[in-house]
């Protein structure tokens, strides 16, 4: 298992949790973003900077993901592509997307996009809470223990 992180929108506190887990377990971890993401100098922790542009980082992650890999993302379409390739996808709030749940999440996302494009203000996600951080760390630990 390798960990791929959609680092463009990944909160710093979640990136730090991922780095600690990678250091502790030795799992290979790569942060992918269209900007420089500083990572500690470790043999198993890497950063890839892709050109700026719509979904370029997502496309790079999908291209490199192999069955059994874990992708950290809150991007629902990216999670769907990863699951289709046989990978796992975990949100920065600790929600594990599955084959059974991802289509419903895509439908909700598309509905909210339609609402926003028609001028209805839907608001954004709430701030990352301490509970979200704990859920993420616990779920990540469980996934790494299974590998």
Swiss-Prot record:
Cross-referenced InterPro entries: UPF0178
Pfam families recorded: DUF188 (PF02639)
Annotated signal sequence range: none
Database matches in HAMAP family: UPF0178 (MF_00489)
Similarity annotation: Belongs to the UPF0178 family.
Protein name according to UniProt: UPF0178 protein VS_2364
Organism, scientific name: Vibrio atlanticus (strain LGP32) (Vibrio splendidus (strain Mel32))
Taxonomic path: Bacteria, Pseudomonadati, Pseudomonadota, Gammaproteobacteria, Vibrionales
């Amino acid at each position: 298992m390798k960990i791929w992180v959609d680092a463009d929108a990944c909160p710093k506190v979640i990136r730090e949790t991922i780095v600690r887990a990678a250091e502790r377990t030795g799992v290979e971890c790569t942060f992918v973003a269209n900007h420089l993401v500083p990572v500690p100098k470790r043999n198993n922790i890497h950063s890839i900077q892709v050109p700026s542009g719509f979904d370029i980082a997502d496309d790079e992650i999908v291209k490199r993901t192999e069955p059994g890999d874990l992708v950290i993302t809150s991007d629902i379409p990216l999670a769907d592509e990863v699951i289709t390739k046989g990978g796992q996808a975990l949100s920065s709030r600790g929600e594990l997307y599955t084959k059974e749940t991802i289509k419903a999440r895509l439908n909700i996302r598309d509905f909210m996009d339609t609402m926003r494009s028609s001028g209805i203000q839907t608001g954004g996600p709430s701030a990352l809470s301490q509970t979200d951080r704990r859920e993420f760390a616990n779920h990540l630990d469980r996934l790494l223990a299974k590998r």
